[in-house]
Amino acid sequence: MLPIITYPHPLLKKRSEPVTLFDEELRQFLDEMYITMLAKNGVGLAAVQVGNPIRALIVNIPDEEGNQERENLLEIINPEFLSKEGEIQFNEGCLSVPEFYEDVTRFDRVRLTYQDRYGERHEIEAEGYLAVALQHEIDHLNGILFIDKLSLIKRKKFEKELKKRQRASL
């Protein structure tokens, strides 16, 4: 299992680099990301969250029973949005911002192009929860956290909670 870095780690604010080598090392890394995401009860994980600032992420939305089957796993490398439409409010959390959840406004429908673990190009259209998860993880690749999208009042609430937790852990 890979260690997850948490806010305010400076790597989380860095733009990730494109993947150019689609080799066995990358595939093994993606497998380790999947194991880590499941162990931490996540639905998505960007490579930068485990300390590797490359443009790679995984998303696995649970089914109705809460299962995250391997065949439903999306491995998204070098993503580029083609279109974004609509608006949705979604209560988000993040493995790199533990124990904090807040409503974030996102696009409701997205279309993007990406490469898979072998470098093959694909296109996907997503809406609702999947669209939100993809935007959240792609934001990580651009050095953006969901807390960066909060209103000033909600951001201050987060900073206050963070300071409180930091004092409690001393």
From Swiss-Prot:
Single annotated GO MF: metal ion binding
Catalytic reactions of this protein: N-terminal N-formyl-L-methionyl-[peptide] + H2O = N-terminal L-methionyl-[peptide] + formate
Uppermost EC category: hydrolase
Residues noted as binding Fe cation in the record, renumbered to the chain: C94, H136, H140
Pfam family, one: Pep_deformylase
Cofactor: Fe(2+)
Catalytic residues (UniProt): E137
E.C. number: 3.5.1.88
Gene Ontology biological-process annotations: co-translational protein modification; translation
SUPFAM superfamilies according to UniProt: Peptide deformylase
Presence of keyword Ubl conjugation: no
Cofactor binding, per record: Binds 1 Fe(2+) ion.
CDD domains: Pep_deformylase
The entry's keywords: Hydrolase, Iron, Metal-binding, Protein biosynthesis
Domain of life of the native organism: Bacteria
Protein's job: Removes the formyl group from the N-terminal Met of newly synthesized proteins. Requires at least a dipeptide for an efficient rate of reaction. N-terminal L-methionine is a prerequisite for activity but the enzyme has broad specificity at other positions.
Family: Belongs to the polypeptide deformylase family.
Matching NCBIfam families: pept_deformyl (TIGR00079), PRK00150.1-3 (NF001159)
Full protein name: Peptide deformylase
Organism of derivation: Wolinella succinogenes (strain ATCC 29543 / DSM 1740 / CCUG 13145 / JCM 31913 / LMG 7466 / NCTC 11488 / FDC 602W) (Vibrio succinogenes)
Organism lineage string: Bacteria, Pseudomonadati, Campylobacterota, Epsilonproteobacteria, Campylobacterales
